Amino acid sequence: MLDYFFLLAFCDVYSTETFWYHFFLKSFINDANPPLGFFFLPKAALADFALIKLFPSSDESPESSESDSDLESELESDTESELELESESELDSSSLLEGAFVCDFSFDLEVFSFTSGMPLETRSDNELKEGRTFLGRS
């Protein structure tokens, strides 16, 4: 089993102009800094949530793997219910949330907020070597 997991997602953020954002979470594995965990897309982009892949750590027991499966199915059902609520109401561009947050296994939280006109924040080489996140746009 892989000792890290990542989430790769494609989403369409509907605003005055439509952009395809490609979020990719890179994992850096070392002893001092555990690998990165997961990120969540903006609520407005849930309709285009494409792919979740979870790889439990090799030191986890089968029981914890089952709970991960339960958590994943719970996440999917929550996403479906939110989608139903959003489809019932009309959304205009001023009401959409744009941004994402990234969380690692030590639960340090970094918030990235951006609009289509602003460049995304990038990290220096040293921060990448230390296992920090890099959030990019294709």
From Swiss-Prot:
Residues 60-91 have a biased composition (Acidic residues). This is Uncharacterized protein APQ13. The lineage of its organism: Eukaryota, Fungi, Dikarya, Ascomycota, Saccharomycotina. It comes from the Eukaryota. Residues 57-94 are annotated as: Disordered. Partially overlaps NET1. Disruption phenotypes caused by deletion of this gene may also be a result of a defect in its overlapping gene. Disruption phenotype: Confers sensitivity to dithiothreitol (DTT) and sorbate. It comes from Saccharomyces cerevisiae (strain ATCC 204508 / S288c).
